[in-house]
Amino acid sequence: EKFKSEIYSGEELEQLFKAIQGDPSEFGVIMAAFYGLRRSEVVGLKWDAIDFENKKISIQHTVVTAKVNGTLTEIARDKTKTKSSCRTLPLIPACEQMLNKMKKEQEQNRKVCGKSYCTDYLDYIYVDPMGKRIRPDFLSQHFPDFLVAHQMKRIRFHDLRHSCASLLYANGVSLKEIQ
């Protein structure tokens, strides 16, 4: 049976945003729903991609999971899936606040954890409290469990990207601009 993609309405997204607060997947969900980012783009976001002064966010790095010699490994790339995926978007206030909060939390965690804090991913935004970069598969594995636990309509993490596109289109944004 072929999988049927589902999307969230604006109202369902509002419910999701309330429920997801404080969850480890919150940043990924917000970025996928607000900006239509792929999980590889969310995990690949680096601090130098955020221009707080000019209120812009550049999507230019990805982190993907691939099999190398029979072992699953993460591969960081300084490129996106397609040329048109490389884009600059406006930094909306809600995301700017979240990013500022995350930056402060990371600095605090680094002080508290001292030498135990992983310094391999200091340039990445989406890291855990010990400084390790969040894995792309975490989002697609954790998200469905979160929805079930909160009795919300089941969609795939990638469907947040489609929900974003549908809402943009419904609000008068052209298909070319969404693309």
Task: Give the location of each predicted region.
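Basic, Lys/Arg- and aromatic-enriched nucleic-acid-binding interface segment
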Residues: 1-45, 52-53, 84-86, 94, ...
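Flexible loop/turn segments at secondary-structure boundaries
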Residues: 38, 66-67, 134
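Short, basic (Lys/Arg/His-rich) helix/loop patches that form interaction surfaces
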Residues: 14-25, 35, 89, 105-115, ...
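Residues in the helix-turn-helix
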Residues: 41, 56, 177
